[in-house]
Amino acid sequence: MSNTQHLGTKFIHAGAHPDPSTGAIMTPIYQTSTYVQSAPGVHQGYEYARSQNPTRFALEEAFAVIENGKFGLAFASGVAATDAVMRLLVPGDEVVAAHDMYGGSFRLFSKVHEKMGIKFIYVDTSNPDNVIGAITAKTKLIWVETPTNPLMNITDIEAISVIGKKHNCIVCVDNTFASPYLQNPLDQGATIVMHSATKYLGGHSDVIQGCLVMNDEALRDQLYFIQKSTGAVPGPQDCFLVLRGIKTLHVRMQRHCENGEKVAAYLRQHPKVARVYWCGFTDHPNHDIAEKQMRGFGGMMSFTLKDDSIAAAIKVLSSTKIFSLAESLGGVESLINHPASMTHASIPREQRIANGLADGLIRLSVGIEDAEDIIADLAQAIG
């Protein structure tokens, strides 16, 4: 598909090919574990569903298209996709990673891959000098989230990619919070893009999935081998759901962005709110970088109350009626979350506080309901 097409057209048609036998416009769900061969080793390109599945292949093509990449790979979850990238490394290798990343990524790094001899150095990647200062001869990977979860810090993808190339490091960007509608890290020089497709790509809170997109064929072959060998693949039903979700990504993201701007502005003027973390504010520390590399600022944000007690935060978290108290994000419905006890509970409190993630921080995934109803819900919950 041509990269000159507008985003909506690209998302609707990504990975879509009419079924040759029936003409079905939607990719069929190939619910099979194996494929018949006419003779040993003689087949139609499909041997076993862990290695090949037509529904998954269509989705992987779509992933590549929407991220302006050449190769896409689908995984059973975002964490599985992250794990695959880590398996490119060998004992003794080092990783420079964002210090305020998603708690699940931190858990994977600190509790699984550190035991395998990988060293992780956590820095504030929003300042490229911090990354440069952390790189050694053993550094093989730079792991970036932008915007970060949940503090919405912004990292200059282009600047970090230049650093990575200079030091022969893979640069992998977790693009989950932005989605391909708002940001395409490969265009900024990144080596790999990772998504938890559970979030905005699926968009309906009904599937768990992850993906990787890259341009380098040799790297794709390595990651495909890992995908196949570890078996971290999604089933065809899940692939179908994400394929369907991608078709409406652009219209959903437009509403997420519109609602996000309204909610952020409301919270900022609320007398009981101390601070709002949203990268669309012109006084956000790296707003100029966000404006340069993003098409909009999305519906993810966090805030703290002037009463910074956990009890005050819990009162808000337990009082919403439209916002559902739940982990995850990026669905059509609005979600409210307490990172300290939910998504980031695996990070030691001292480290979490040092990174700026307060006990009373509240994270919002602003959905696509009517903005007036979303704001009214926050108003009654905050009081």
Annotate each predicted stretch with a short phrase:
Residues S110, K119-I121, A137, D307, ...:
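PLP-dependent enzyme catalytic core of the Aspartate aminotransferase-like
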Residues M1-Y46:
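N-terminal glycine-rich, Lys/His-bearing helix-loop that initiates the first secondary-structure elements
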Residues T34-D83, R87-L88, G104-K111:
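Conserved N-terminal alpha-helix of the aminotransferase class I/II PLP-enzyme fold
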Residues S2, F71-K272, Y277, D288:
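Conserved PLP-enzyme active-site core in the AAT-like
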Residues L241-V251, G299-D307, R363-G367:
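Short, well-ordered beta-strand elements within core beta-sheets of diverse protein domains
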Residues S2-G8, A14, R275, G330, ...:
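Positively charged, small/polar-rich N-terminal and surface patches that mediate targeting and assembly
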Residues I29-Y30, S38-A58, A62, L335-G360:
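Glycine-rich phosphate/pyrophosphate-binding loop
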Residues E261-K321, L325-G330, I347-I353:
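Conserved small-domain helix->loop->beta segment predominantly found in fold-type I
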